[in-house]
A protein has these predicted regions:
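Eukaryotic intrinsically disordered, low-complexity segments enriched for acidic and Ser/Thr/Pro residues
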Residues: 1-214, 218, 250
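TPR-repeat structural position
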Residues: 233-234
Length: 250
C-alpha cells in the first residue's frame, strides 16, 4: 500500500467535489445536462457526521459524470477501497420509453441488470418527451412511468421520479434533490463505517512487528479528506489531529 502514497496525493488534489454518476440508458444526458447541472452545488444537504448526528450542509460541491467517462471506467478494483472517497456517491439512471411492451421486454430487464449491484446507491429519472398538447403520448408516458414505479419502488424506499422534458416543475426538482441527497448520505455512512473498521483494525497492530504507518496514513487521511470534501470540517480536523498524534507516537 505504501506504493500508493504518491498516487493518493495526486488523486486528492483533483477530487475537490463528490461525484454523481449518470447511467444514460436512453441517450438523454445532452437533453437534460444543463438543467441538472444548475442544481449544483447541492443545496441544504442533510448528512450524518461521524457520530451519526445530522448536519445541514448549505452547499455541497458535486459534479455529474457519465458512467462511460474514462475518469470512472479507468479505475482498477484494487484501488477502489483505498481511494473510496472519489467513487460516485449516487447514480442517476436516465431512461425514457413510449411503449409498454418495449418497457416490459427490453427496458425493464436492462434496468434490473443495472441496479442489481446493492453496493451502489441509485435512483431512476424517467424522462417524458410527450408534448403537453399530445394527449395520447402524455397518457402513454404516464402508464409507462406507473409501471416503472410499480417495478422499482418498494415500501421502504421510492426510487423513481419523472422529468418532463417540456418543462419540469418545482415538485420534480424537490423530489430529485431529496433522492440525490438520500443516496449521498447513505453512501457516506457506509464509507465512514468501512474506514472506521479498517482504521480500528490497523490501530490494534500499532505495537506489533507488522505495524505499518503508511497503510494507516492512507486510510486515515482518506476518511479525513472525505469529510473535508463533504464539508464536514469538524470531523475532518479531528481525523487529522488523530493522525498527527499517532505519527508523533510511532
Amino acid at each position: 500500500m505504501a506504493n500508493y502514497l504518491a498516487q493518493f496525493q495526486t488523486i486528492k488534489s483533483s477530487s475537490d467535489r463528490i461525484v454523481i454518476a449518470v447511467e444514460d440508458v436512453s441517450d438523454l444526458w445532452l437533453n437534460v445536462k444543463d438543467s441538472f447541472e444548475q442544481r449544483l452545488p447541492v443545496k441544504k444537504a442533510c448528512l450524518n457526521n461521524k457520530a451519526r448526528n445530522p448536519v445541514l450542509v448549505e452547499n455541497l460541491p458535486a459534479e455529474f459524470i457519465q458512467t462511460t467517462d474514462s475518469r470512472l471506467r479507468s479505475r482498477f478494483p484494487q484501488e477502489q477501497y483505498l481511494f473510496w472517497f472519489r467513487e460516485p456517491y449516487a447514480t442517476v439512471v436516465l431512461v425514457t420509453c413510449e411503449d409498454l411492451d418495449e418497457f416490459k421486454t427490453i427496458l425493464k430487464p436492462r434496468l434490473k441488470l443495472i441496479v442489481q449491484n446493492d453496493e451502489r446507491e441509485w435512483f431512476i429519472v424517467f424522462v417524458s418527451k410527450a408534448h403537453p398538447s399530445n394527449d395520447q403520448a402524455t397518457k402513454m408516458a404516464k402508464k409507462v412511468y406507473a409501471r416503472l414505479e410499480a417495478d422499482f419502488n418498494t415500501k421502504k424506499r421510492e426510487r423513481c421520479c419523472k422529468f418532463d422534458l417540456h418543462g419540469p416543475d418545482d415538485e420534480f426538482w424537490d423530489d430529485f434533490d431529496s433522492k440525490m441527497v438520500d443516496c449521498i448520505r447513505n453512501t457516506l455512512d457506509k464509507r465512514v463505517q468501512f474506514y472506521e473498521e479498517e482504521n480500528r483494525r490497523l490501530s490494534e497492530q500499532r505495537f506489533t512487528p507488522i505495524w505499518n504507518f503508511c497503510n494507516f496514513f492512507i486510510l486515515k487521511e482518506s476518511l479525513a479528506f472525505m469529510f473535508e470534501v463533504t464539508n464536514l470540517h469538524e470531523d475532518s480536523l479531528r481525523e487529522y489531529d488523530e493522525l498527527e498524534l499517532c505519527y508523533s507516537e510511532s
